């Protein structure tokens, strides 16, 4: 089993690739397989942002592993005007839906209820299979509700590191 604990800076080449859905890339502990079929155990630091498409990891044996976002069922949303697209994003955000933002479009996980809502708002909604890389949000630490005695799970907010969008 390839055991991975470490995220590293971008590399020129990789020894293996992991192709993972967004939900899998959010996990700090995961059993998965490389694209070549080798078993992998991910043991990453908890409370960190999801693995991004193109991110690199280093296995305990020194091998370099590239992460690829796996195509998954999404809704691709466009609108007749920027205002209507902004309105659609507002209503999705009001429902705490993670969104991937593009120039003139939004993407979100396929959901028939949200699709119907978007169509009622006048949006054009198309089902697609594509890699999913939603925005991390302004605080990047996720959504937590700690209770008495759960202090070790109360991760404080961290300002998002805004990067260049592709």
From Swiss-Prot:
Protein function: Involved in urease metallocenter assembly. Binds nickel. Probably functions as a nickel donor during metallocenter assembly.
UniProt keyword list: Chaperone, Cytoplasm, Nickel, Nickel insertion
Gene3D superfamilies: Urease metallochaperone UreE, N-terminal domain, UreE, C-terminal domain
Pfam family, one: UreE_C
GO molecular function: nickel cation binding; unfolded protein binding
Residues in the signal sequence: none
Disulfide bonds listed in the record: none
Protein localization: Cytoplasm
Protein name listed in UniProt: Urease accessory protein UreE
């Amino acid at each position: 089993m390839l055991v991975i604990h470490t995220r590293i800076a971008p590399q020129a080449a990789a020894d293996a690739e992991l192709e993972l859905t967004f939900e899998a890339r959010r996990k700090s502990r995961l059993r998965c397989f490389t694209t070549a079929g080798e078993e992998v155990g991910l043991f990453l630091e908890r409370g960190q942002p999801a693995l991004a498409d193109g991110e690199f990891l280093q296995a305990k044996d020194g091998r370099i592993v590239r992460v690829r976002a796996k195509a998954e069922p999404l809704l691709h949303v466009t609108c007749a005007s920027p205002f209507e697209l902004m309105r659609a994003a507002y209503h999705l955000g009001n429902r705490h839906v993670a969104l991937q933002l593009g120039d003139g479009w939004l993407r979100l996980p396929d959901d028939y209820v949200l699709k119907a809502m978007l169509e009622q708002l006048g949006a054009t909604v198309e089902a697609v299979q594509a890699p999913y890389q939603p925005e991390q949000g302004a605080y990047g630490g996720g959504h937590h509700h700690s209770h008495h005695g759960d202090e070790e799970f109360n991760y404080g907010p961290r300002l998002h590191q805004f990067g260049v969008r592709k």
